[in-house]
Amino acid sequence: MNTLSSRRMVPLPCGPVGVREHGSGRPVVLLHGLVANGLVWRHVVGGLGDGFRCIAPDLALGSHSPALPGADLTLPGLARTVIDLLDALGIEQAVLVGNGYGGDIAQVVAAEYPQRVEALVLIATNAFDSDPWPVKLLARLASLPGAGLLQSAAIGLKPVQRLRITYGGATKRPIPADVMAEYLRPLRMDPLVRKDFRRFLGGLSPAYLARYSPRLADYQRPALVVWPREERYFPAEGASRLAQTLPQAALEFIDDSYAWAPEDNPAPLVALLRDFLGRLDRSS
């Protein structure tokens, strides 16, 4: 059963944001990567069960509802969106879990708003000055006239979906067709979403995390860094640097997965999260 099949829209200053929720208890906010949405966490949420209030927003990363004109779609702007979402849901503090570019956003949130982050989990993400070549290439291509429509059409082809520059670098296994359709529908069908995505890609810069990642040294709360051993986008040295920078971090590696562990091989990730969240319960 897909525990995240139901979505509601939450009005925020940046525009309406789709949110999927499941369970009750300690709030756990789950942030996805590029051209995905909250569905990427469906197996993780199912594995965690009903004892946590799992919240999976659809951030403006290419599989979202259009943002308002002028909305800040930089990493700091999307971090502010996470805080606005917590405010809208009446949540003072949450465990923050980020994968891929969701992990970039989570780092900015923890650095800028540490009092709102009860604990931090980073899964295969950028760190410090890393800047994956596939995303740099996508950003260059997206800046070309008419490229957004062409890219959105091409990504609908299964062979293109398995290229390393697309989902083939994020997951070892093909993503189920119904889930892939949900990921791609906004980008393929809505020119405003394509415009948002171009804005996000155009605003990416290693300078952001070069500024924010070192500030995680001041984050004095429990943290977990999880890295797939076969990860193909984000350098493994980023895992070590993050774990060394975060004062209370543990570093764990998982097998048989690329970057998107929640989609690719969620079972070992769920086990690590259950243990981590269980330790939070015992220490509170």
Model-derived regions: residue spans:
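A short loop-to-beta-strand scaffold at the N-terminal edge of the catalytic core in hydrolase folds
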Residues: 12-21
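Helix-rich cap/lid subdomain of alpha/beta-hydrolase
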Residues: 132-185
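Conserved hydrolase catalytic core segment
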Residues: 92-133
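Active-site loop/oxyanion-hole signature of alpha/beta-hydrolase fold enzymes
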Residues: 55-101, 271
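Short beta-to-alpha linker loops that shape the active-site pocket of alpha/beta-hydrolase fold enzymes
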Residues: 44, 58-63, 69, 126, ...
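Catalytic active-site module of serine/aspartate enzymes centered on a nucleophile-bearing elbow/loop
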Residues: 249-284
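Conserved HGGG/HGGXW glycine-rich cap/lid loop of the alpha/beta-hydrolase fold
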Residues: 20-64
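Conserved serine/cysteine hydrolase catalytic core
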Residues: 192-241, 253
